[in-house]
Amino acid sequence: MTNTKYYPEVSSNADFAGLEREILKFWQDNNIFQKSIDDRNGESEFIFYDGPPFANGLPHYGHLLTGFIKDVYARYQTVKGKKVERRFGWDCHGLPAEMQSEKELGISGRLAIANFGIEKFNAHCRASVMKYANDWEEYVTRQARWVDFKNSYKTMDKNFMESVLWAFKELYNKGLLYESMRVMPYSWACETPLSNFETRLDNSYRERADKAVTVSFVLSHPVATTTGSFKEYRILAWTTTPWTLPSNLALAVGSDIDYALVPKNDVCYIIAAYSVSKYAKELGLSGEENFEIIKGSELQGLHYKSLFDYFENHPNSFKIFAGDFVVEGDGTGVVHMAPGFGEDDQILCESKGIELVCPVDNSGKFTKEIPNLEGLQVFDANDKIIIKLKEQGNWLKTEQYIHNYPHCWRTDTPLIYKAVPSWYVKVTQFKDRMVELNQQINWIPFHVKDNLFGKWLENARDWSISRNRFWGTPLPVWKSDDPKYPRIDVYGSIEELEKDFGVKVTDLHRPFIDELTRPNPDDPTGKSTMRRIEDVFDCWFESGSMPYGQAHYPFENKEWFEDHFPADFIVEYSAQTRGWFYTLMVLSTALFDRPPFLNCICHGVILDSTGQKLSKRLNNYADPLELFDKYGSDALRVTMLSSNVVKGQELLIDKDGKMVFDTLRLFIKPIWNAYHFFTMYANADSLKGKLNFSSKNVLDVYILSKLKIAVQKIEESLDNFDTQTAYHAVSEFFEVLNNWYIRRSRARFWKSEKDTDKQNAYNTLYSCLDTMAIAMSALVPMISEAIYKGLRHCEERNDTALSGKSNVIARQDTSLDKAISGVSHKIATALSVPRNDAISVHLCNYPTLSDFEINHELVATMDNVLDICSNSLFIRSTENIRVRQPLASIAIISKHNNNLKDFEDLIKDEINVKAVIYRDDLENYTSKKLSINFPMLGKRLPHKMKEIIVASKKGEWEAITGGLAICGETLNSDEYKLVLEPYSHIKGAASFENNSSLLILDLELTPELIEEGYARDIVRFIQQARKDADFSITDRILIEIISEFNLSKIIDNYGDFIKEQTLGEFAKNFTPDYVSKVELENYQIQLKVKKS
């Protein structure tokens, strides 16, 4: 007799990593990704922008996290019927590429690059920038992320660069660009300025100890005072950058700040009154003195003598001015102004007609304008400057000052602020419009909109977009080389360049673009030449140009771009609110007056288990490929996307992969176990499951209702960009499916008759697995594919079956038959399945279950049954009473017992009690305890919290309609909770049904109950022996039990029960197939089993 097996032979201990490799091969061999795009109608699209990473390094966990999130929503929108193109992109230009090439070439600095040759250097950058592209493809593919690598865009491609040129000219024509010499964050290690937002990336601020120095400036004239006359009047200024003192040109005070006139010998020192005590030692004070006080406004306009003679004749300099940036805090209340090295300094000095001086070169070294410091790096010059100040008598105090200081995001060297020439976007001109457009964006987490991102927009500054570097898109600006005949030409296309310069442009990079020159049309002498300025674009301008750059807009694909802008969705980590998200917003607003995206997730960062940043140097993380090969990528996906990191918080992940293993064990395995159970028993019975929702069995109706609830919850969650809740819905469903539905339905699967009830059980389980495979396909794409393929597309397997008909005998669950008639429920006759029999789960449509109506009454009742059972089992565990040990009774004390009575036999069987007692007199067993939601209530009533806490402990409160009265206030439902608290003399009690009902287990064990418990233990021992002997679930066996423990009474009373449960007969004197030794009540038992 042949046994037809319709499903794969599935191992309960699956090799998930190997399984995933098979799925990846299936996708590749059948071109499933492309089919998922081609099969969708282009009229309904989900537009997704893939932020371009640098390819000159391997992907890290942050990249994988972002990739998982991108993949989830792309897959989900696909099964929702949307066409989702996923074009990958590469960020190729900028400092990361240049620094890597400098390292590999063994050169450093702009001069060294120029000597090496710009053409050769950029050629090396071009070759090295895609060094890890193949590795990226391996990692991305292995994580089951679908992207289009073949048609990827690169910011170094000529077409992309041309779109950047177009954007620049558009901004220029709109009057949104200007050139200026302004103070900016400056990386002397990279010899380039940085944007303000670049100093906010990747925790660029580091704790740093600097020497802070207090110096005295000698006033040129006396200060009007009643204190008396002094030989000198000196005003004290404090700075953490002594190296800027040689460039001092002014001092700033606060107009409304009080300044003390502090005499010491024949000198009067002027210092903010709030700072006097900090300088008591240096000024020889006892602390008892009183000083004359003047306002800062009285110091305005006073002249002082320059500290050094480098710029002593600089026009309009060495005066005291009022500055609104001078506030009480650190220092002396006096700020020294070096307009070449401070933003506030420059603004104030320019307003007073003081031109800046900047005696520091591109490498952060002093120039010949400071002869005695020439060639010295500015930070190395601090000590020499302090020594000079001491020699001159201008020094008062030096101290170590520890503060957070910005560092270069590429070299980790401390930045300086330095005046450099640059081109700027006038962001301040349209920042209010950006704030308005931001309100059209759905941010996840929500608070990012008006806080992290919104505040940044409100305080946006003009953006420096030019860099004096080499490898990047060149600024399309040509200037006359003769100031007598000034002219500026800005180009926005290759066509414009070719027209004016009369040559074919094949490469827009330096040095080729620099070679384009022509006579200045505005020079009648014909001697001056139009030459391109040397600067290239800030690479953030290029990544912000991604939406149109990838399409070569407006030169090609004009209609396509207009249909694909803005994006429906983007995602990156939270610091990109100062990076990519910001530059997208700036350029989108300036060029199109539209937000660049409509939905945006800002996820958090991944750290090691101690909270440290993941680092090769610290060796504190595992190679992701190792985790994939060990546990599979679905497990890592779930670990990350079910955590708070998707809500912008941190995720701490261990190096050994224990978290991922736990996910495999607690999330992936339960899904697989349900599938394994179905295939094993369906093959054993030669039955096929089918999508069918017409069963009237109460457990079927319940689990199908729970299925639809889960499917709807997943859909609702992913519509709201909430993977956490979606994963919870999956986990919660399989918890009920495995530990309730399958376990309570085993009798139906095990029985020998292939009747309608048995087929309904298979159909219901099949329907659950098939439907969930589709619903969760975006969340666990590979295990979903494996289950779907196994259910839908396996070939029939004809194996030789064991002789004889399956005569599995199992206990009958009569409680369900009773419940069917006791609970009203509505059942539709069929399931509407709006999808074809696709070869891949990722080509299906999301299930709607529109023809099946949830039985909410049954769900509520059955959920209470589960609650009762789980609480009862918890009490058993707490009291160390094993589940196989019967108990006399359970008392259920509730106002809603009628529905529960229909499930009495089920409750008795599940928690192993002999009787269920129903009561409704809760007041005799429990009291209600008030639990305050302190964070919630504290926001509304902070001034009454102490009073409310005292009253809650005393029980001085009253439940009223719509809330709770306490201390003259009415608490809202989310500000408190009433918890049932059993009286202290009651044992074995627990609340259920949202703290509205109570259960009490009778924990007393009689001799009869103990004896029955032993019988159940014996059944378990025999079942384990069957499993260890590798017997089939249908095999009948012989059993012999040898023990010091007297089992005769147990065998006499419970022999039939034991034989029925184990498909066995008691026998002696046979040669066993398997022998096991177990222990019962400290007695050794030997079990012998043999196939009969």
From Swiss-Prot:
Keywords: Aminoacyl-tRNA synthetase, ATP-binding, Cytoplasm, Ligase, Metal-binding, Nucleotide-binding, Protein biosynthesis, Zinc. Its EC number is 6.1.1.5. It is found in: Cytoplasm. The keyword Nucleotide-binding applies. SUPFAM superfamilies: Anticodon-binding domain of a subclass of class I aminoacyl-tRNA synthetases (SSF47323), Nucleotidylyl transferase (SSF52374), ValRS/IleRS/LeuRS editing domain (SSF50677). InterPro entries: aa-tRNA-synth_I_CS, aa-tRNA-synth_Ia, Anticodon_Ile_ABEc, Ile-tRNA-ligase, Ile-tRNA-ligase_type2, M/V/L/I-tRNA-synth_anticd-bd, Rossmann-like_a/b/a_fold, tRNAsynth_Ia_anticodon-bd. A motif ('KMSKS' region) lies at residues 613-617. It comes from the Bacteria. Its cofactor is Zn(2+). It holds the Pfam family Anticodon_1. Its main location: cytoplasm. GO terms for biological process: isoleucyl-tRNA aminoacylation. The keyword Aminoacyl-tRNA synthetase applies. Monomer. IleRS has two distinct active sites: one for aminoacylation and one for editing. The misactivated valine is translocated from the active site to the editing site, which sterically excludes the correctly activated isoleucine. The single editing site contains two valyl binding pockets, one specific for each substrate (Val-AMP or Val-tRNA(Ile)). Catalyzes the attachment of isoleucine to tRNA(Ile). As IleRS can inadvertently accommodate and process structurally similar amino acids such as valine, to avoid such errors it has two additional distinct tRNA(Ile)-dependent editing activities. One activity is designated as 'pretransfer' editing and involves the hydrolysis of activated Val-AMP. The other activity is designated 'posttransfer' editing and involves deacylation of mischarged Val-tRNA(Ile). This is Isoleucine--tRNA ligase. It comes from Rickettsia peacockii (strain Rustic). The lineage of its organism: Bacteria, Pseudomonadati, Pseudomonadota, Alphaproteobacteria, Rickettsiales. The gene is ileS.
